[in-house]
Structures are given as C-alpha cells and as structure tokens.
From Swiss-Prot:
Belongs to the UPF0102 family. It comes from Escherichia coli O127:H6 (strain E2348/69 / EPEC). This is UPF0102 protein YraN. Pfam families: UPF0102 (PF02021). Gene3D superfamilies: 3.40.1350.10.
Amino acid sequence: MATVPTRSGSPRQLTTKQTGDAWEAQARRWLEGKGLRFIAANVNERGGEIDLIMREGRTTIFIEVRYRRSALYGGAAASVTRSKQHKLLQTARLWLARHNGSFDTVDCRFDVVAFTGNEVEWIKDAFNDHS
C-alpha cells in the first residue's frame, strides 16, 4: 500500500481503492496528454468494471490500468490474466449494448496502461474479442 503525508506530518496508509483511483487518474492525464478524449471512469456493469473509457478519433478504447511496485512476478502488464480479459470483454459488451452498440457496430479496442515502479507502458490493442 502507498502512503500519503497528512496535515499532522505522520503518513497514513492509502486503501487499495484510493491507490487504484490515484493510478487511474494518473493514467487518464497521461493518455489525455497523448491526445485521447475521456468518456468515463470506473464503469460498472454486471460482473465487472472498466477503469477508463476513452476515445481516439472514431475508436472507443476500453482501458485497464495496472500498478505494481516492481517487475517481480512479471510486473503490472502480466497481471491482466485471461480471466480478467474475459470480464473486461463482457463488461464492455454490456456497456456498448446500453449505448446502442456492439463489437460489430463500434470500432473499439482494449488497451492496458501498466505502471511498474516508475515506468509506464501503454499496450495498445492488448487483447480483443477474438483472443
């Protein structure tokens, strides 16, 4: 868990959710700096959550944000398992349907923004519905 200084000067522990929210906000700012346009964050559908939904031109991008302190055990990008990919695909499918779309009618892709230590890696088209 990360720590943050408080007014009293003694650091306090961030919750896992607060840490995740902070890295997602960092990823959003970083991607906006690369020209992507923000659509939504922390989108919940039955059985899953998508960290960020952004747009690049006509492409809707579903983004999973991961953070790991070190590359031990494969680092942040390696933590997006097949099971997690399946949940993201299902969540995106439901979100698209709620917005009158589908994988057949909307140009979309699945990216991963992985923070490992001080390094950031943007994996475009990390997986798809044909994987």
